[in-house]
Amino acid sequence: MNLSVPEGFFQVANRARFELRGPDAIRYLNGQVSIDIARLSPGKARPACLLTAKGKLCAPLQIWRQGDSLIIEGPSELSETIQARLERYIIADDVELLPAAQPAPLFHIVSSSPAPSLAIDRIGLLGFDTTEKPVGLPEFSLGEIELLRINRGVPIWGRELTEDTLPQEARLEDLAVDFDKGCYVGQETVSRLKSVGRVNKRLHGFLGSSELPAGVPLFLRPPGDPSTAGQITSHAHDFDMAQTAALGYLNRQFETLTRFEIADETGRVLGEVERREFPIL
């Protein structure tokens, strides 16, 4: 697989969708999420953050226009959370939030060609969704999807993203935050971090040669130093290149370092990694 310009497809699953409609839909949603809804381009989805009043993440979203409605998509395990959070501030607004069925099956094609349907970035690469199974393109395995996602630094819920995550910690501010838009829930914290503060940890990419075990906590530490510098959240091994790409949070005081050991909960060193810019490979 060519990680620089991969072309292929995978089936999209485990997504929750809602339709927001009504005369006040754009204005209302603009006050709830981190992007400027009025700037949405037809036929193109944008990532957004749904936040708490304290600026922490409720859910990572994809939002796009569909006719006169707005479609809101997020992780299926957050379906009830998304619905409750979006309905909480509907008072005198002329809007209606409804569950929206995801087409089944739904496929996502990673391609640099112009999108004939909804253009959406699902793993850090240009692509589009289609209901017809592609012909003549390779289907990505789960391992390849994970490697592509990690290589591009795309965080997902349950790994890099939790209810305690601030957008800037996960590097969501560039694609999923419009700092020049009007007020929205959680904006005060996000804007303050941009102007006068720094987060205590931040998502980084790492590259090493050792295969790492799945399903166990993995910690970053300076070489020869038992201090915990951070934690690995996702990793995938590229067998063709004999290298492991990983995502993890690095505590701010260790961001000047480039090389780290990977250790398990017992302190046993499992390998070494180098901090890398995205794309990692």
Where is each model-derived feature located?
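Short amphipathic beta-strand starts and helix->beta connectors
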Residues: 1-5, 48-60, 91, 112-118, ...
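Short, conserved charged micro-motifs
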Residues: 24-29, 79-83, 113-115, 132-137, ...
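Short, conserved active-site entrance elements at the starts or edges of catalytic domains
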Residues: 148-172
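Short, surface-exposed ligand-recognition loops at beta-strand->loop->(often short) alpha-helix junctions
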Residues: 19-25, 38, 111, 207-214
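Acidic, proline/glycine-enriched N-terminal capping motif
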Residues: 1-58, 67
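Glycine-rich, small/acidic residue-mixed loop/short-helix segments
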Residues: 61, 165, 171-177, 185-187, ...
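Acidic, low-complexity central loop/insert segments
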Residues: 8-19, 59-156
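A common structural junction motif
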Residues: 36-37, 86-95, 136-144, 224-228, ...
